[in-house]
Amino acid sequence: MMYRTVGFGTRSRNLKPWMIAVLIVLSLTVVAVTIGLLVHFLVFDQKKEYYHGSFKILDPQINNNFGQSNTYQLKDLRETTENLVDEIFIDSAWKKNYIKNQVVRLTPEEDGVKVDVIMVFQFPSTEQRAVREKKIQSILNQKIRNLRALPINASSVQVNAMSSSTGELTVQASCGKRVVPLNVNRIASGVIAPKAAWPWQASLQYDNIHQCGATLISNTWLVTAAHCFQKYKNPHQWTVSFGTKINPPLMKRNVRRFIIHEKYRSAAREYDIAVVQVSSRVTFSDDIRQICLPEASASFQPNLTVHITGFGALYYGGESQNDLREARVKIISDDVCKQPQVYGNDIKPGMFCAGYMEGIYDACRGDSGGPLVTRDLKDTWYLIGIVSWGDNCGQKDKPGVYTQVTYYRNWIASKTGI
């Protein structure tokens, strides 16, 4: 017996050319939209994610010399660790997702130093963070076991996901970082500083009138020049404003107290340094951040390019400016600065000169107490000088004289704990 399947009769239908064209266009459109959505979700719909990592560097010598001028400087250890984490993820399968890392804390422990680092990645928002958290820890564990640069205990590695707001605030609270690229242009004279370019710059004001510059070194402390308080000594009439304009200020704080160096004497101009504590904590943002302080043992060579900022006058006898200005100058050697036609014996220990011997760019009235800064290879900025004194502004053979921060580093620490 043969089985016969039931068949349905068919009739051929010829599609017209225009209908075929429409179908092709529709098909291509669907494919293009699908690919576009896929690209959008895989490439463009990616969000920054922050992860807190910690591990221990096992070396008692680091702990013993922590903070001292020895083989392991804090700055070097921080840079070495950040470079190490960079290399680990750039050499991993997640190199396209990795953005950066930042060491936010180094804590001495009995057998070494605990490192806390914030790692920033970019992933599609659809993926599970818990899975990535474990993967990041796994990558760190595997790579660290084969490292020779630092004796890290691989079993001490811990990784935890952070909320975007907490991660960003933690990164912002780290010193010496800015979001605006360095302006390569070259206050007597200088140029107006872009918004958020120098987020540690502050204006010290007496009865709401600008008197001096100051530099933010924590969320409650600033560094400035002692001579700023020579005339007005009541802290309750002083305020500090932040931002690139004096009016309107981005943020304002009352002064709780200021501490002038005990050995400061106006006639000699030595020990021209003071610290200022504000009455309430400063809220960090892209526009307001703290700068790093160098170690006491750090040295900065003549001819190094540095940057000065301030609201001071544009010429000798002029008035302070509402807009923050910036200028690029160079450190001048003591040998040159102590020449008779320059400043001779007026240059004492704890002072240095910066600017140009031909004049041009210089600090001026109203810039006093403000910052002279430089950056390292990791683009971290350090306060190395405080605007102190000089003859006129931008005059030939009369560069600006600055208080040397490294000379007073231990004094700053003794007063502020920073």
From Swiss-Prot:
Function statement: Probable serine protease which may play a role in cellular senescence. Overexpression inhibits cell growth and induce G1 cell cycle arrest.
Chief location:
membrane
Please give the PANTHER family that the UniProt record associates with this protein: ACROSIN-RELATED, SUPPRESSOR OF TUMORIGENICITY 14 PROTEIN HOMOLOG-RELATED
State the organism of origin: Homo sapiens (Human)
Gene3D superfamilies hit by this protein? SEA domain, Trypsin-like serine proteases
* Gene this chain is encoded by: TMPRSS11A
UniProt keywords (A-Z) are: Cell cycle, Disulfide bond, Glycoprotein, Hydrolase, Membrane, Protease, Serine protease, Signal-anchor, Transmembrane, Transmembrane helix
The UniProt record lists the keyword Hydrolase: yes
Q: What is this protein called?
A: Transmembrane protease serine 11A
Does the keyword section mention Plastid? Answer: no
Q: Which residues cross the membrane?
A: 19-39
Task: Specify the glycosylation sites in chain numbering.
Answer: 153, 303
Disulfide bond annotation, renumbered to this chain:
212-228, 337-353, 364-393
Example of a GO cellular component annotation carried by this entry = extracellular region
Q: What are the subcellular locations of this protein?
A: Membrane
What is the similarity comment for this entry?
Belongs to the peptidase S1 family.
Q: Which residues lie on this side of the membrane: Cytoplasmic?
A: 1-18
Describe the location of the Peptidase S1 domain by residue ranges: 187-417
Q: In which tissues is it expressed?
A: Expressed in esophagus, liver, colon and lung. Down-regulated in esophagus cancers.
Topology term for the membrane:
Single-pass type II membrane protein
